[in-house]
Amino acid sequence: MAGKARVHELAKELGVTSKEVLARLNEQGEFVKSASSTVEAPVARRLRESFGGIKPAADKGAEQVATKAQAKRLGESLDQTLDRALDKAVAGNGATTAAPVQVDHSAAVVPIVAGEGPSTAHREELAPPAGQPSEQPGVPLPGQQGTPAAPHPGHPGMPTGPHPGPAPKPGGRPPRVGNNPFSSAQSVARPIPRPPAPRPSASPSSMSPRPGGAVGGGGPRPPRTGVPRPGGGRPGAPVGGRSDAGGGNYRGGGVGALPGGGSGGFRGRPGGGGHGGGGRPGQRGGAAGAFGRPGGAPRRGRKSKRQKRQEYDSMQAPVVGGVRLPHGNGETIRLARGASLSDFAEKIDANPAALVQALFNLGEMVTATQSVGDETLELLGSEMNYNVQVVSPEDEDRELLEPFDLTYGEDQGDEDELQVRPPVVTVMGHVDHGKTRLLDTIRKANVREAEAGGITQHIGAYQVGVDLDGSERLITFIDTPGHEAFTAMRARGAKATDIAILVVAADDGVMPQTVEAINHAQAADVPIVVAVNKIDKEGADPAKIRGQLTEYGLVAEDFGGDTMFIDISAKVGTNIEALLEAVLLTADAALDLRANSGMEAQGVAIEAHLDRGRGPVATVLVQRGTLRIGDSVVAGDAYGRVRRMVDEHGVDIEAALPSSPVQVIGFTSVPGAGDNFLVVDEDRIARQIADRRSARKRNALAARSRKRISLEDLDSALKETSQLNLILKGDNAGTVEALEEALMGIQVDDEVALRVIDRGVGGITETNVNLASASDAIIIGFNVRAEGKATELASREGVEIRYYLVIYQAIDDIEKALRGMLKPIYEENQLGRAEIRALFRSSKVGIIAGCIISSGVVRRNAKVRLLRDNIVVTDNLTVTSLRREKDDVTEVREGFECGMTLGYSDIKEGDVIESYELVEKQRA
């Protein structure tokens, strides 16, 4: 192969895969990128030598290789095999009779080839003069003796060509007539029939019979020695003598062609040849074939298994929204919450544009990089036969920590390293049932008075000592809000607890938040101890409470159940010690409360807020390990180093053991309430984990807050809609979260929308005011105030700031504001009817209708509609003028005649004018 060659061409030539060729080139120090790259001629030569000295098809004697395979497969001699193949080809073309063909005698006699021959110009250049001897002595084939050959009939004493024809069959077979591929008078594609009789020997200017096919010739095949010369064969030679078998990259009729094959083409052009030159017997050869294969091949190559598989998969692919998408085998695809179509396409090896088009046709308009909701991903996956699993936050966080070799939620070490820890108890129940009063009594502190409106709006964590059987035991209490707006905070408290105390007022009974607290505790598989409070009040009925709670699976021990009921009075202090003993007994009997205090600390952030002097402050509950000063800690998307720890009494501590609630100072930002925290080796790891969690949270928020618009609703979505933008600021993260969820749960109407554009912990700053001014938002401050400059800026910009101390007041005000933004609803109120009796035309005012009021009243400037035969002719007309007896009047009542103009000309006698007014209706 002259010049450069591509890797995949060399692979086909050598009969190996492209990967093997690339690997061999890399071993030789030739770094090639891909199978389509080219290599220089010396590199290609070394590559062929490295594969056992394999050479191109023309150089290694393609005829010899093909003849070996055919002789071995059929068990016949070479001559019989070639004769049978040629006979079959001639018979298949219907050549039953043979006749001599007149051709141009100025050129050599060469049989035709089924494929296309070289151009006439190149043929004339490559055709050597007649009578020039060939410089390529023959090479003996296997199984044949190298006896000297007889002189050529037309050239005595001249050695034979490089490709002699087969010996005639016994009895003397007449020679076949070849055809000149350089002759324009002979069609290249038409086969030549066999002549019935041998032709006499030809002169250099005449046609010559096939070598070995002379009259009476029956001698052995001449031997072949040496290598063929690179030039073309002499005229009259049975084959072309190009050593590269038809050029650089094509397979022609050079060495390896059947007798009668034409010479090879010029620099890559296919040479002429006989039928199926070098291929299987009876197969029609083509002009060009695959590399490394001798002779011609069928024009249309066979498809590889990979191509067939791709075509089959394409036909079997499902059609979703008019787009053909990949078809899965039911495999599970795991996607993070808030994933995009690009993420999904990468998992299934699909084109993201196809997924976008499919969703668009289904009425869902998303981009390839936009976060998509869980339901959309699952629906799209089911249509494509994929089981899409949206990873839960816990599993997602576990996968996030795996690259850092970190785990959360498991105690490390052996059993002997586990130590008994205090139980964590959550006080739950309906609002105003006495939860905080009970905790006050236990702590001997007045916490309730500090809460606005007497309603707990934070999660408080405290640890108290209890004297049980002469030994002091510690119990950690978590106080959760009971208001309906704090559902998430109650659920968070249930997940972080060991035992739940359900406080139910004896005079009030089971309420909605009581049932919700039961559901949270049962969902978290937490044992429940029921405290029936306010037994000192009139109308208290503890037995009624026991009966009501039986419906929810809480059966008292008195009724044969396993739930402990304690009748208490938090105000007086009745049976408080019995309640604490019940908690400890339940913990000892039903739970194995042990933890490893020697490992790095892990736990949960109960509450967090932004302090003016201390910065972000987080109340954390250590669940396992020991938290120490100087530890690098990460909680949610916040990270930092522990600079200070304070217990519930405000005392600085150096270390916090399991089940200890402490305030941690040192975070770079405010953690979210309920975020898991853990200690890592260095600040760099903490920052990387926090950044990844922050990105994950943004994607999930974008997927949840994105408003879906279908094609059917596109027109209405483009219309102007009312939207109330809010900025929420609070004193701690839990309160802000609860306020946002409560506000987003307000159901008013589809015409108005509520959008929280920003939220944060701490006072209202100038940045908040600037954002509110740019987005026409209202700032809601919960237990926080605005700074002096922020107040002045808000006054100048006209930004409204609303302050609240009780959460339900904020909810009520926002709901009223949303209802005020609704478009008014108008109700039609019928005023009267007038019948047109006569028409008068005026050049000044147009047509005047002379009417009589048949019912009700007709007022000037009132809305009217024109009826003809009880069919509305036109609507939304206005009484522009109203007169009675030449006097302008404001209204005319029933039974009186009047004249009026409507600004409408299509009026006839007998028409009816119906007067009405639109009255705004109060929304429900």
Swiss-Prot record:
Q: Give the subcellular location.
A: Cytoplasm
For region Disordered, the annotated ranges are 118-325
Q: What InterPro entries does this protein's entry cite?
A: EF-G-like_DII, EFTu-like_2, IF2_II, IF2_N, P-loop_NTPase, Small_GTP-bd, T_Tr_GTP-bd_dom, TF_IF2_bacterial-like
* Residue span of region G2: 454-458
Q: Where is this region: G4?
A: 533-536
Which keywords describe this protein according to UniProt? Answer: Cytoplasm, GTP-binding, Initiation factor, Nucleotide-binding, Protein biosynthesis
Low complexity composition-biased segments: 202-212
Q: What is its main location?
A: cytoplasm
Residue ranges, annotated region (G1): 429-436
What ranges does the record list as Pro residues composition bias?
150-173, 192-201
Q: Which residues bind GTP?
A: 429-436, 479-483, 533-536
Composition-biased stretches, type Basic residues, lie in 299-308
Task: Report the residue ranges that make up the tr-type G domain in this protein.
Answer: 420-591
SUPFAM superfamilies tied to this protein: Initiation factor IF2/eIF5b, domain 3 (SSF52156), P-loop containing nucleoside triphosphate hydrolases (SSF52540), Translation proteins (SSF50447)
Q: Where is this region: G5?
A: 569-571
Region of interest (G3), ranges: 479-482
Asked if the record carries the keyword Hydrolase, the reply is no
Q: Which Pfam families does this UniProt record tie to the protein?
A: EF-G_D2, GTP_EFTU, GTP_EFTU_D2, IF-2, IF2_N
Q: Which GO terms describe its molecular function?
A: GTP binding; GTPase activity; translation initiation factor activity
Q: Which residue ranges have biased composition labelled Gly residues?
A: 229-295
Q: What does this protein do?
A: One of the essential components for the initiation of protein synthesis. Protects formylmethionyl-tRNA from spontaneous hydrolysis and promotes its binding to the 30S ribosomal subunits. Also involved in the hydrolysis of GTP during the formation of the 70S ribosomal complex.
The record's similarity note reads: Belongs to the TRAFAC class translation factor GTPase superfamily. Classic translation factor GTPase family. IF-2 subfamily.
NCBIfam families registered for this protein in UniProt? IF-2 (TIGR00487), small_GTP (TIGR00231)
Name the UniProt record assigns to this protein? Translation initiation factor IF-2
This chain's source organism reads Mycobacterium leprae (strain TN)
Q: What is the lineage of its organism?
A: Bacteria, Bacillati, Actinomycetota, Actinomycetes, Mycobacteriales
